Amino acid sequence: MALSDTQILAALVVALLPAFLAFRLSTELYK
């Protein structure tokens, strides 16, 4: 089953958004 570009982009956003938020939170706590 081939993934469409839209599905790939959606998966990237879903994966990166929590990672980005966790990174921001960790940098805020580190200061």
From Swiss-Prot:
From the record, give the transmembrane residue ranges. Answer: 6-25
Provide the gene name from the record: psaM
Q: Which organism is it from?
A: Synechocystis sp. (strain ATCC 27184 / PCC 6803 / Kazusa)
Give the CC-aspect GO terms. Answer: photosystem I; plasma membrane-derived thylakoid membrane
Name the UniProt record assigns to this protein: Photosystem I reaction center subunit XII
Query: What start and end residues bound the annotated signal peptide?
Result: none
Instruction: Give the family, as the similarity comment puts it.
Output: Belongs to the PsaM family.
State its location(s). Cellular thylakoid membrane
**Example of a GO biological process term:** photosynthesis
SUPFAM superfamilies, alphabetized? Subunit XII of photosystem I reaction centre, PsaM (SSF81548)
Q: Which UniProt keywords apply?
A: Membrane, Photosynthesis, Photosystem I, Thylakoid, Transmembrane, Transmembrane helix
Superkingdom: Bacteria
